[in-house]
Amino acid sequence: MPIKYFEAPEIKKQVDQLAEECEFYHVVPQFVFCVRSKGSKARRTIARIHGLGRIWQGVLNLPPSYTIEVISEIYDRMSADDRERTLIHELMHIPGGFSGGFRPHKGYVERRNVDAVYKKLQSDRAAKKQKKLFFQ
């Protein structure tokens, strides 16, 4: 069965929210798209990020853009925490210049860095919730 791609508005909403909450201010939400794929033969891949390379940007006269693809067979069975970590991981591949290129795994997009961002996110959410309860 060939891979099929479907729009994923719920993933897009989560990605936009994570980019804001994680303070990834270099990410331009209107140029980050999200799809769900079905039929992939990948066994270890949970999600992928695709960039619109400079040559295509120039030829098509388009701005830098990224597409985050989640592989439904694996991603959908994960816990909510692991799904968030996965999306953070993919967002961390987007460089500060939002140029269409990628940051590498080695030295930046590593588990410990993803976990550090996720831990800060959880801490910020808890503080926000506590503040909300305090002022009610």
Residues of each region from the PLM?
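Active-site recognition of the HExxH zinc-binding catalytic motif
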Residues: 83-97
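Metalloprotease/metallohydrolase-associated module, dominated by Zn2+-dependent proteases
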Residues: 1-81, 97-136
